[in-house]
Amino acid sequence: MRTLAVETSCDETALAIYDDQKGVLGNVILSQAVVHSPFGGVVPELSAREHTRNILPIFDRLLKESRINLEEIDFISFTLTPGLILSLVVGVAFAKALAYEYRKPLVPVHHLEGHIYSVFLEKKVEYPFLALIISGGHTDLYLVRDFGRYDFLGGTLDDAVGEAYDKVAKMLGLGYPGGPIIDRLAKEGKKLYPLPKPLMEEGNLNFSFSGLKTAILNLLKKEKNVRKEDIAYSFQETVVEILLEKSLWAMKKTGIKRLVVVGGVSANSRLREVFKKASQEYGFELYIPHPSLSTDNALMIAYAGMERFKRGVVAPLDVNPQPNIPLEEFGRIWT
């Protein structure tokens, strides 16, 4: 079977074609980072406008590069939730238009579910497993019992980890998106400043990054000659330590020794290095997708959509996007 997938939940316009036997047949992503960079973050109205401007040219490019026409597609997968509502509207409307015009079934996908199954595009993971989802909008831990069966273990109480990266980068005058910039700059850091690690009582699987962000702001005000490289290094080491400790506690609590780490922040080189070393030291299976699959893309939506379609899930043409349906609830609704 083949699906065409649509992803417009934030600031990437992405389309892909995936075949459950042949694999990836087409994949196109257009980032809006340059558009949002002057503002230090994503501006929802601008994001929606760029999606509207770009989705048809990207669609044409996808069909040309894949040499596939819509008659060869079995169904349309699309991101229904969560995301910026104005951005979601563009992708959902486009998916619905294709489904109506070409009489194709419409299959809804949860954005976080897509991230979880991005690793399956490279290697299947045995159930059950733990999923750490880390991005600009999410920092969550889930127990994945099977496809569509998700137990929420903990999440951020304030900023998402990717959001914290962007805000610290803005404090340092580094530009947007902050994650890749801090990752590169941290490699040149030498001095490790002690920074707070909130909610670190053993067994607490929730996250908090606002205090860490405030501590860096205070440090910058207090020490005038502080090196940006050292701040980036200190911030990143602290963040990676928090994420690893929480993951280890989740393993201890559940007894599960398989960990999937996904989302845009999973592309971070230091995080990959530390988690890989920890997997060898503590004896757990670690799965992190290739960096090209870590950030938002339509291939992950295609894979998850394929799994949903095989289970008989189809949405009506009057389905509307939702800004934030919890993953565990989505798994129960769309089964």
Swiss-Prot record:
Cellular component annotations (GO), alphabetically ordered: cytoplasm
Catalytic reaction(s) noted: L-threonylcarbamoyladenylate + adenosine(37) in tRNA = N(6)-L-threonylcarbamoyladenosine(37) in tRNA + AMP + H(+)
PROSITE patterns recorded: GLYCOPROTEASE (PS01016)
Compartments in which it is found: Cytoplasm
Binding site for Fe cation: 111, 115, 296
Binding locations of substrate: 133-137, 166, 179, 183, 268
Highest taxon listed in the record's lineage: Bacteria
The protein, known as: tRNA N6-adenosine threonylcarbamoyltransferase
Species for this entry: Aquifex aeolicus (strain VF5)
